[in-house]
Swiss-Prot record:
The chain crosses the membrane at residues 33-53, 77-98, 113-133, 178-198, 226-246, 288-308, 320-340, 347-367. A ubiquinone binds at residue 201. The gene is MT-CYB. Heme 1 (or BL or b562) is low-potential and absorbs at about 562 nm, and heme 2 (or BH or b566) is high-potential and absorbs at about 566 nm. This is Cytochrome b. Binds 2 heme b groups non-covalently. The cytochrome bc1 complex contains 11 subunits: 3 respiratory subunits (MT-CYB, CYC1 and UQCRFS1), 2 core proteins (UQCRC1 and UQCRC2) and 6 low-molecular weight proteins (UQCRH/QCR6, UQCRB/QCR7, UQCRQ/QCR8, UQCR10/QCR9, UQCR11/QCR10 and a cleavage product of UQCRFS1). This cytochrome bc1 complex then forms a dimer. Heme b b566 binds at residues 97, 196. Its cofactor is heme b. It comes from Hylobates lar.
């Protein structure tokens, strides 16, 4: 008798995606992050839903409603900190997932890669708007600084900023609309993630060797379900360690002070996962130039398939390309550090050098290294 999972239309869909899916036999732990991102998204939606039950998106009560959640709601503190630190875990998994795609040449699956870039942008937008909601000092001033970047758009910049704000400054209207978008975007992300999977399953997963997986495939269940569950336990271990021992480690202390439009904090900075882009933004003296560099730092990912000059898909057997890849990783860590530092010497210079090197590595060094390797292997 045919199992129900193979006959029922709904279960058949799940079966083809998670159970009987033919998967390459040699994919490593780096292929775990897709499922971990799915787990993070589910966690964020569930905790966010419970937070939304007690939160009030109003400038006069938002801050105290967050304090109320933390102090008075049953297990409100753990829901809040799971949501805040869950976002950090989300971005750690996201960066590692993108890094894996870059290293093993998964970007050659164009549709999957491009939807992934849209997912990254949507997640960044969601996280930014979520950071504004507690209505602390850094929430308010972070929102003011980042939304003000729109004023760099020629001719319509000022009107655009006021349109986004819903007034002449970041105020109640801004908070209300940010809450609305913060609530709806995760569901859009879920739909995009389903599309991401749909296109991935059209081609099948890549593998560390960068060669065809067709001759040697195994069922996703039980092999990779067990492997993914191990990854999930490790993720939960990290998350719960953070939530239960040091929940404010990645936050900003000034966000425990209620938003005050008359008092600017000495150093305005976003959450840690935006610091690399923030450093690139600050390293360009011109406002419009900085905004363009900020946008390009993310959108450059869309150019990577066109910049792929190597004859091999994966970097596994390409030492020169590996060198440029790890240079890029170290450079991003330096940018993240610089983004959190005050705007003074020597941080300005380090930021400018690191920003220039970021674009040079992707646009020049990586394609050049691949061409040299082609020559060395006589694959001209």
């Amino acid at each position: 008798m045919t199992p129900l999972r193979k006959t029922n239309p709904l279960m058949k869909l799940i079966n083809h995606s998670l159970i009987d899916l033919p998967a390459p036999s040699n994919i490593s732990m780096w292929w775990n992050f897709g499922s971990l991102l799915g787990a993070c998204l589910i966690l964020q939606i569930i905790t966010g839903l419970f937070l939304a039950m007690h939160y009030t998106p109003d400038a006069s009560t938002a801050f105290s409603s967050v304090a109320h959640i933390t102090r008075d709601v049953n297990y409100g503190w753990i829901i809040r900190y799971l949501h805040a630190n869950g976002a950090s875990m989300f971005f750690i998994c996201l960066f590692l997932h993108i890094g894996r795609g870059l290293y093993y040449g998964s970007f050659l699956y164009l549709e999957t890669w491009n939807i992934g870039i849209i997912l990254l942008l949507a997640t960044m937008a969601t996280a930014f708007m979520g950071y504004v909601l507690p209505w602390g000092q850094m929430s308010f001033w972070g929102a003011t600084v980042i939304t003000n970047l729109l004023s760099a758009v020629p001719y319509i910049g000022t009107d655009l900023v006021q349109w986004v704000w819903g007034g002449y400054s970041v105020d109640n209207a801004t908070l209300t609309r940010f809450f609305t978008f913060h609530f709806i975007l995760p569901f859009i992300i879920t739909a995009l993630a389903a599309l991401h999977l749909l296109f991935l399953h059209e081609t099948g997963s890549n593998n560390p060797l960068g060669i065809s997986s067709q001759p040697d495939k195994i069922a996703f269940h039980p092999y990779y379900t067990i492997k993914d569950i191990l990854g999930l336990f490790l993720l939960l271990l990290m998350l719960m360690s953070l939530v239960l021992f040091s929940p404010d480690l990645l936050g900003d202390p000034s966000n425990y002070t209620q938003a005050n439009p008359l008092n600017t904090p000495p150093h305005i900075k976003p959450e840690w996962y935006f610091l690399f882009a923030y450093a690139i933004l600050r390293s360009v003296p011109n406002k419009l130039g900085g905004v363009l560099a900020l946008l390009l730092s993310i959108l450059i990912l869309a150019m990577i398939p066109a910049l792929h000059t190597a004859k091999q898909q994966s970097m596994m057997f390409r030492p020169l390309s590996q060198l440029t890849y790890w240079l890029l990783v170290m450079n991003l860590l330096i940018l993240t550090w610089i983004g959190g530092q005050p705007v003074s010497y020597p941080f300005i210079t380090i930021g400018q050098v690191a920003s220039a090197l970021y674009f040079t590595t992707i646009l020049v060094l990586m394609p050049a290294a691949s061409l040299i390797e082609n020559k060395m292997l006589k694959w001209t």
